[in-house]
Design a protein with these regions (language model features):
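Charge-rich, well-structured scaffold segments of protease-associated domains
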Residues: 6-200, 206, 214-234, 240, ...
């Protein structure tokens, strides 16, 4: 997550402090973003103007492959974490864009529940780690480990590049090869994700989360039941669970949702089918419930 932010803080060809902001303000983009997932980081751009699209592609490729992070440690400190002293009498605190962003995320019980679910279901794979960053552990990341991660994984050999739309595909591929891909030798990157081995029995986990002072514990419990189901490559199974998700939980008058509410299990029922991990998850979550 810190790398996702940091590579967009200037590069060899575009040594601006924040080229991403300049593109947001000055380009004709129809989509411009970057997203971190447990198993990948995505840098998507889109534009209806061919020249603009070409420029966006150039800026993003240079950002990902030739970022200024090797020249300026302050990028890591700004986007990741650093010590800060607001005054000589103030306590020394942590600060940083991603650090503060994730502190905000971890103030949400839904975010905490999602993180705990992933850790419990996938303790031995990357899905059990919070790719956004747990604010408790973010300050343990050193600048050297940060750079090592980029050197290891931010390489064309460990990437997929997708081009889609009405364009001269040969021209775009030739540009990518001439200006970027041909400058790298093949690298054997070990980024294969192994499947989590099944547990011998259902795992029961009970954890606490903070509530506001003006809230009590009554009707503030979350009850979550989660199952790993098959493999994401099984499209027929995925379709079946999408239908089950809609029929049981999402459709108007969905029977499972209504039955749980009628039984007083929770005042709201969430959940569904998540096909984004290698091993998909089907979840049923009762919100505003009680321990009993």
């Amino acid at each position: 997550h810190i790398l996702e932010h940091s590579v967009l803080c200037g590069s060899d060809k575009f040594p601006l402090k924040d080229p991403f902001v300049e593109l947001v303000k000055g380009s004709l983009n129809t989509f411009l973003n970057a997203m971190t997932y447990p198993d990948k980081t995505v840098y998507p751009v889109a534009s209806c103007n061919d020249k603009d699209f070409h420029n966006l592609m150039d800026v993003y490729m240079d950002a990902v492959l030739h970022p200024n992070i090797y020249k300026e440690e302050k990028i890591f400190r700004q986007e990741g974490w650093h010590y800060e002293l607001e005054s000589k009498d103030a306590p020394l605190i942590y600060n940083g864009v991603v650090y503060n962003e994730m502190k905000g995320a971890y103030s949400s019980p839904e975010s905490i529940l999602d993180s705990v679910t992933q850790k419990t279901l996938f303790p031995d794979t990357c899905y059990g780690k919070d790719s956004g960053g747990d604010p408790v552990y973010i300050p343990e990341l050193s600048y050297e480990k940060f750079l090592d991660f980029h050197k290891t994984y931010y390489h064309p050999s460990n990437s997929y590049i997708y081009l889609y739309g009405n364009m001269d595909m040969e021209e775009k591929l030739a540009f990518l090869d001439e200006h970027y891909l041909s400058h790298f030798d093949y690298l054997d990157v070990d980024s294969v994700i192994q499947e989590q081995k099944a547990f011998g029995a259902c795992q029961d986990v009970t954890l606490e989360y903070p509530v506001a002072e003006n809230e009590g514990e009554e009707d503030n419990t979350y009850l979550s039941y989660n199952m790993v189901v098959g493999n994401a490559a099984d499209s027929q199974m995925a379709m079946a669970f999408e239908v089950l998700d809609y029929a049981l939980l999402s459709a108007p008058g969905a029977p499972l949702k209504q039955a749980l509410i009628d039984a007083g299990i929770g005042k709201d029922i969430m959940g569904g089918f998540d096909n984004s991990p290698l091993q998909p998850i089907f979840s049923v979550v009762a919100k505003n419930a009680n321990k009993e």
